[in-house]
């Protein structure tokens, strides 16, 4: 009997932790503006928002994004679901609705069976169907390692757009999913242990949270993915020219996350996140393990929004600009 294929063995990094480190990425894209200057580009590279937005008319903006990554779990179908959920989240994070998506697949065809690739695509298809988003083809590359995700196009009303730079001092900050999938995925890759709660979190669409945010009049927010809560909070603070305060005791975590950090299952991406934010973060004396959890590279994480939402956890607030971008209390 053939042993089941462990897809995570073919990944250098895992999920959103395989991103180019944030500091290096910002240097790489510095000074790169739009190919053609136009007032119809509502959101571009300026602040590193979750997607680009172009105005089609007074009532409609076109939202476009792409997101793909290496396996975070060994099950091909679940990986496809997670990657698709994560890609769709970028549109939801902008307050938009995804309409159509294309598969982005890299596959080592001489190493891994094509039947597994089909399972990955099936997972993405099922999530897109649940989201009411057309999945219409895509592009594939014969590559050394497996990677999968989606290019997604959606729409948003310009007056309902959620961006990083629209924060106001005094607003609460709410988080719609618990943290910890990064350290749990790292443990899964190392030991083969399964964490169903983490898979459930990563395959939960941010659709309902985004709808609640739009209904509540939220205009500032992002999703929490590869740069961790601290990294994404820092980007929001910088774009809005404010300070973000995070109440460490209020931040929710998945079961087993603290134990995973204690046992050393921390990805290189999470450690790089912590190094990146250290220069402009007041950690308030919290322990190293807590710092690592707040910097944990999430895959298909929740929304972080300036406002209160039903079912979300208030984890902090926006303050007038101070000495630090982020203050942990």
Can you describe what each PLM-predicted range is?
Residues 41-43, 51-54, 89-92, 125, ...:
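A generic local secondary-structure boundary/capping motif
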Residues 151-161, 193-214, 286:
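Active-site glycine-rich loop that binds ribose-phosphate moieties when present
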Residues 1-13, 24-28, 39, 109-134, ...:
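Glycine-/charge-enriched secondary-structure boundary and capping motifs
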Residues 52-63, 203-209, 274-284:
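Acidic-glycine-rich active-site phosphate/pyrophosphate-binding loop
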Residues 58-73, 78-81, 97-190, 194, ...:
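Glycine-rich anion-binding loops of enzyme active sites
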């Amino acid at each position: 009997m053939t042993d089941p294929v462990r897809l995570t063995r073919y990944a250098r990094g895992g999920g959103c932790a395989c991103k180019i480190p944030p500091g290096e990425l910002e240097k790489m894209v510095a000074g790169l503006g739009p190919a053609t200057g136009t007032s119809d580009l509502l959101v571009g590279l300026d602040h590193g928002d979750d997607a680009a937005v172009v105005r089609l008319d007074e009532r409609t903006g076109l939202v476009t994004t792409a997101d793909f990554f290496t396996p975070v779990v060994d099950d091909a179908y679940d990986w496809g679901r997670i990657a698709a959920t994560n890609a769709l989240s970028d549109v939801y994070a902008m307050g938009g609705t995804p309409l159509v998506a294309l598969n982005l697949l890299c596959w080592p065809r001489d190493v891994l069976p094509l039947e597994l690739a089909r399972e990955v695509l099936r997972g993405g298809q099922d999530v897109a169907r649940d989201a009411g988003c057309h999945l219409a083809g895509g592009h594939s590359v014969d590559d050394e390692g497996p990677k999968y995700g989606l290019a997604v196009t959606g729409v948003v009303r310009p007056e309902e757009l959620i961006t990083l730079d629209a924060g106001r001092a005094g607003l609460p900050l709410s988080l719609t999913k618990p943290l910890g999938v990064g350290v749990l995925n790292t443990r899964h890759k190392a030991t083969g242990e399964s964490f169903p709660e983490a898979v459930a979190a990563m395959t939960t669409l941010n659709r309902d949270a985004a709808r609640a945010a739009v209904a509540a009049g939220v205009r500032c927010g992002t999703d929490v993915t590869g740069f961790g809560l601290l990294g994404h909070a820092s980007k929001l603070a910088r774009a809005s020219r404010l300070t973000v305060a995070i109440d460490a005791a209020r931040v929710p975590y998945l079961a087993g996350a603290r134990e995973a950090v204690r046992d050393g299952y921390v990805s290189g991406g999470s450690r790089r996140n912590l190094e990146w934010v250290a220069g402009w973060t007041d950690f308030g004396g919290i322990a190293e393990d807590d710092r690592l959890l707040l910097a944990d590279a999430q895959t298909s994480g929740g929304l972080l929004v300036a406002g209160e939402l039903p079912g979300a956890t208030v984890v902090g607030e926006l303050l007038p600009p101070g000495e630090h971008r982020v203050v942990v209390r």
